[in-house]
Amino acid sequence: MMYRIRNWLVATLLLLCTPVGAATLSDIQVSNGNQQARITLSFIGDPDYAFSHQSKRTVALDIKQTGVIQGLPLLFSGNNLVKAIRSGTPKDAQTLRLVVDLTENGKTEAVKRQNGSNYTVVFTINADVPPPPPPPPVVAKRVETPAVVAPRVSEPARNPFKTESNRTTGVISSNTVTRPAARATANTGDKIIIAIDAGHGGQDPGAIGPGGTREKNVTIAIARKLRTLLNDDPMFKGVLTRDGDYFISVMGRSDVARKQNANFLVSIHADAAPNRSATGASVWVLSNRRANSEMASWLEQHEKQSELLGGAGDVLANSQSDPYLSQAVLDLQFGHSQRVGYDVATSMISQLQRIGEIHKRRPEHASLGVLRSPDIPSVLVETGFISNNSEERLLASDDYQQQLAEAIYKGLRNYFLAHPMQSAPQGATAQTASTVTTPDRTLPN
């Protein structure tokens, strides 16, 4: 259930209300972002409303209206600003109260707009967070030279993280650069290590379907089936970020994958929406905006840079005094992870559409914390809508869970058959930085 960590969620709640006075509440839309959320109330007639902060993490929206709001409570998992929207105790008999629970301290503003006899009130909630650190100084000069490549006949979905002309990038520095190569997995007999992240767990059940099916139980079942498929294939080794009903933080999941020397991470979830007719699977990859913010964070954390996998950690451990090199290496690492993630997501979608409905036919981009690692390419798979009666029954079915695991496995296998992992001796690709050229992707096309 990752409706709360997408770039923006637009959810419609149907309302059955008995109008009192001139205005009737007709619709609610919620856009839930990482640091900002918008709740849009639509009215027929000029509304009478008010809002107040019951605490820094709770906002009460009062509307002159009676009736029953269907679709509440709307529960999010807590990775974005809004944690839940629920009905509250009204202050009088002529008022409805919506209570918005936040994951962080927040501040609220309201703007009313009119369109003929229709009105909207937009409540904008901003997280009360300290300002971000200033951006690092310009630390690298890039010289981009297009290379001539043969046009492709057709592609089902173009990878936006690939340059259209397969560019090479020169990084000018006084140091010597070792290019981060796709890492070998010698300790496991050159197997490709796939970290499988079963979403939620423990006190966090995730989404709960109309029949009571809990997302955390669906995700761990699919994850275990996927691990079995991977471990039965000599190409792979599957490892779980959790193998029981317990909670792991978003950051902790990436750390577990890194400790396992994972080459790729698959996070498994089940979607949910107030619109109970929504169906289908989708696959999500890290957005550029989140990648840029994560890169700035890694540049600040010099002591953690050496933990990065794939050769980048070794390079950065010896470049503490050279911010030019640090940014260049991290930029290459994030770019590589995004490109690989998008291509694997495309491969998975082609398999998922063979077994069921597809909600998004191309990989979607979002600010997802579990996909934040620059050194581990990753995707998040929404296996279907647990909020839909039919898909809830499918997701709870052992047979369909097996089909989902097989689709994810085949997507991984098809990608890595076409793009075998390569290893290189440390320093084998070293060149002087003024002449180094780095291919558009580390894994060959």
UniProtKB/Swiss-Prot annotation:
<dbReference type="GO" id="GO:0030288">
    <property type="term" value="C:outer membrane-bounded periplasmic space"/>
</dbReference>
<keyword id="KW-0574">Periplasm</keyword>
<dbReference type="GO" id="GO:0008745">
    <property type="term" value="F:N-acetylmuramoyl-L-alanine amidase activity"/>
</dbReference>
<dbReference type="GO" id="GO:0009253">
    <property type="term" value="P:peptidoglycan catabolic process"/>
</dbReference>
<keyword id="KW-0732">Signal</keyword>
<feature type="domain" description="MurNAc-LAA">
    <location>
        <begin position="194"/>
        <end position="413"/>
    </location>
</feature>
<feature type="region of interest" description="Disordered">
    <location>
        <begin position="424"/>
        <end position="445"/>
    </location>
</feature>
<dbReference type="Pfam" id="PF01520">
    <property type="entry name" value="Amidase_3"/>
</dbReference>
<feature type="signal peptide">
    <location>
        <begin position="1"/>
        <end position="22"/>
    </location>
</feature>
<dbReference type="GO" id="GO:0051301">
    <property type="term" value="P:cell division"/>
</dbReference>
<keyword id="KW-0961">Cell wall biogenesis/degradation</keyword>
<comment type="similarity">
    <text>Belongs to the N-acetylmuramoyl-L-alanine amidase 3 family.</text>
</comment>
<dbReference type="InterPro" id="IPR050695">
    <property type="entry name" value="N-acetylmuramoyl_amidase_3"/>
</dbReference>
<dbReference type="GO" id="GO:0071555">
    <property type="term" value="P:cell wall organization"/>
</dbReference>
<dbReference type="GO" id="GO:0043093">
    <property type="term" value="P:FtsZ-dependent cytokinesis"/>
</dbReference>
<protein>
    <recommendedName>
        <fullName>N-acetylmuramoyl-L-alanine amidase AmiB</fullName>
        <ecNumber>3.5.1.28</ecNumber>
    </recommendedName>
</protein>
<keyword id="KW-0378">Hydrolase</keyword>
<comment type="function">
    <text>Cell-wall hydrolase involved in septum cleavage during cell division. Can also act as powerful autolysin in the presence of murein synthesis inhibitors.</text>
</comment>
<dbReference type="InterPro" id="IPR002508">
    <property type="entry name" value="MurNAc-LAA_cat"/>
</dbReference>
